Amino acid sequence: MIASLDELYHSELFFLPVMDENAWLVGLAIIATFAAEDGAVRMPTELVAPRLSVEEQYCLFVEKLALLETCQHFFIQHKLIAWLNLPPAISDLLLLDSELFSRAARFPFLELAINENYPGLNQGKNNETLANLAMHFPLMLANFGSGEASTKAIFDGLFKRVMLDKNFIQQRAEMISFEPFMHAIVAQISSSCESLMIAGIDTEAMFARAAPLGFSAFQGGLWPPVPVSQLIKLVQR
């Protein structure tokens, strides 16, 4: 996809691994970076996304679905989950556009990731769009703890999985209360979702601290994103 910002940028898609406590692959998030035409400048999606038009967001979402289609047998063979971020602007389109809905619904291993800044998230199941999405697709709250939402949507059972925000984790990790605080979160949230995951695992030391705390999966700089050509390496030992 080509995005028109101060200059033209093209999207490049990668797979961000999510591991279990034994460092076995359980799933992959499809993420995008944006590179200038000359390749000299690269920007992550979170910096570019606020400047993308609805049409550009739609094109990026479709591009991710197309990539997923090319490697769906890899996900099925290895029983992996795929996560795609769902921008708020695409939510209604996904429910209203039958072709887009069908393209996303064909993947039984696909889950849609939603951020805490999703409009009306604090309404929980009273948010009609969010409730309808949860009826048709497994949802993941991708950055719980970023400070932009309450726990209502979680306790309403809208999310199959919840991922703790990486910045939240890295700030808390510096405190001596990190372990008991994480145990408290696990105890509070686990009954409201199928899987509670943790981001911000950038080192072996951090992985060793987090692994015994009751989380089902882990994500971070310890397992960097890879292009589609390197997917097979993630399941080799």
Curated annotation (Swiss-Prot):
Ranges for the EAL domain?
A: 1-237
| Keywords from the named record | Repressor, Transcription, Transcription regulation, Virulence
Q: How does it assemble?
A: Interacts with FlhD in the FlhC(2)FlhD(4) heterohexamer, inhibiting its ability to activate transcription.
- Free-text function comment from the UniProt entry: Acts as an anti-FlhC(2)FlhD(4) factor by binding to FlhD, decreasing its ability to bind DNA, and thus negatively regulates expression of flagellar class II operons, decreasing motility in nutrient-poor medium. Required for resistance to host phagocyte oxidase.
Concerning its family, UniProt says:
Belongs to the YdiV family.
Q: What is the lineage of its organism?
A: Bacteria, Pseudomonadati, Pseudomonadota, Gammaproteobacteria, Enterobacterales
| Membrane-crossing segments per the record | none
Q: Which SUPFAM superfamilies does this one have? A: EAL domain-like
Its protein name is: Anti-FlhC(2)FlhD(4) factor YdiV
The signal peptide here is none
Species of the source: Salmonella choleraesuis (strain SC-B67)
